[in-house]
């Protein structure tokens, strides 16, 4: 089966399209919640570096993927939930295949809206890969970090995938000095999922669980 370009949206601090590991970005959007309303603009490039590290890690697993920057982090790695929900909607509008949400949601008051938005996206054909929240949900592929895992390794648990917390190696920079943690674990799973989709895989959850290093 011939491969097809997989469209991946990265909800984060933006992406630097000139980064040598990222190679290219198809486009994107900047999203803010300000003065009680959501605003969209063209400011999707990264000023913080986090989203670029995520994009580079995804690119390492899926070199042919089409990457889209959905910037919700601006001056710091924080975002209003309304901006995150709109980011998910934007991914649906653009008919993306995958949405990478390294941020997740640990606020129980806002979690219901987040889970609902993810479920809607999944129903409309956009697979959401996100940091695990406060409960196990089937509305997205939930990911947590495991420092014992490396690169392609995945560990399957009921309702949860564990992956490496380390970013794609960058020259002589020690990995502990680069961004690391659950955000990068999510990126590893998203990148592997993109590669599986490009090969025609239809059931991502099953395919990812089969890759589990514990099986």
Tell where the protein language model's regions lie, with residue ranges:
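Active-site core segment of subtilase-fold serine proteases
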Residues: 1-61, 65, 86, 170
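Proline-centered loop/turn at the N-terminus of a beta-strand
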Residues: 7, 66, 125-127, 139-141
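Active-site-proximal beta-strand/loop segments in catalytic clefts of secreted hydrolases
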Residues: 11-14, 70-74, 101-105, 131-133, ...
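Extracellular S/T/G-rich loop segment that most often corresponds to the catalytic His/Ser-adjacent loop
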Residues: 12, 135-198
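Short glycine-/acidic-enriched loop or helix-start segments at secondary-structure transitions
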Residues: 19-21, 110-111, 152-153
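Subtilisin-like peptidase catalytic core
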Residues: 40-107, 190, 199, 210-214
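Substrate-binding/access-modulating region of protease and related hydrolase catalytic domains
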Residues: 73-138, 177-187
């Amino acid at each position: 089966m011939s491969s097809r370009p997989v469209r991946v949206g990265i909800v984060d601090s933006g992406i630097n399209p000139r980064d040598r590991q990222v190679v290219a970005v198809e486009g994107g959007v900047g999203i803010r919640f300000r003065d009680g309303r959501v605003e969209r603009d063209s400011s999707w490039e990264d000023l913080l570096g986090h989203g670029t590290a995520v994009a580079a890690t995804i690119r390492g697993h899926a070199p042919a993927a089409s990457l889209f920057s959905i910037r919700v982090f601006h001056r710091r790695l924080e975002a209003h939930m309304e901006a995150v929900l709109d980011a998910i909607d934007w991914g649906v509008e653009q008919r993306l295949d995958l949405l990478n949400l390294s941020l997740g949601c640990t606020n129980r008051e806002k979690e219901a809206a987040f889970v609902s938005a993810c479920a809607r996206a999944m129903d409309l054909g956009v697979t959401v890969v996100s940091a695990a929240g406060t409960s196990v949900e089937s509305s997205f592929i939930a990911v947590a970090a495991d420092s014992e895992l490396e690169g392609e390794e995945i560990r399957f648990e009921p309702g949860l995938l564990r992956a490496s917390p380390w970013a794609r190696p960058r020259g002589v920079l020690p990995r502990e000095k680069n961004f690391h943690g659950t955000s990068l674990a999510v990126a590893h799973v998203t990148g592997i999922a993109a590669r599986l989709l490009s090969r025609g895989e239809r059931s991502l959850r099953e395919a990812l669980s089969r890759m589990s290093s514990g099986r």
